[in-house]
Amino acid sequence: MHLNNINSILFLGIGGIGMSALAKYFIAKGINVYGYDKTPSEMTDALTDLGAKITFIDDAKCTENVFDLVVYTPAMPKDSFLLNYYQQSTIPLIKRSQALGLITKNSFTIAVSGSHGKTTVSSMIAFLLKECGIDCSAFLGGVSVNFNSNYIQGKSDVVVVEADEFDRSFMTLSPNLIVLTSIDTDHLDIYGTRENIVTSFLEFLNKLDDIGILIHNEKVIDEILIRGKKRIYGFQIGDYKATSLKIYPTHSTFSINDSEEVFKLNYNGRHNIENALAAISVGLTMGIA
């Protein structure tokens, strides 16, 4: 499927954080965006202000419009009238993750994966890239404080995305660089066992080709076997180690690999240093930080 010929698009569950980021992308492209959600919210209000036409009634009235594509979130109820209608329609119907995969297919994709920290690390990477002169785009799983949005529009071919393991959504992506923060026992309702979770992550990591790069936390070192290059970050071992840590009530400072350069972070706690280290590791690996 190609997105170049789309003039109108319907989002089922448009108020969700991931769906609304996609909607903002298409609005910025000048495409007519329509949406359904169960209830109004700050996000649907913001999308309406941008030009989206949104309904909160799950009935046939919405189907009076003709759409080139319908995108839905897996969170849509199975008995939704609109979801069932478009499942039986000839109009292309795809999941949110599939739409994200199509959008980023021909970009240099930095995919942030892991059980924790994806939104924070993705936001930090996008901010770092922008500050270093790379006008990236980003699809975030939360509203970034620095950008006041969950979608960041850029002019370069670099895009930062969250690679969500839920429902194996990350398998739709074509990553060039992957950040892996952690692998924990989450989503057992989908995967059943930790072994299945690890297997799914490894399948995603192996979507990297021979020149792809994986940057991962030292905590998951025993579970990683992939093609391409690897860089490790953490506190004890690896290519990028946080050293000289100082944690204060309102901020933290640290260096990398015992260098004289000191990084100041406006948050305290080792986990925030770890997130910042992941983002800086991307910059160092790309030769921009």
Give residue ranges: language-model regions.
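Phosphate-binding loop of NTP-binding sites
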Residues: 25-31, 48, 61-63, 74-216, ...
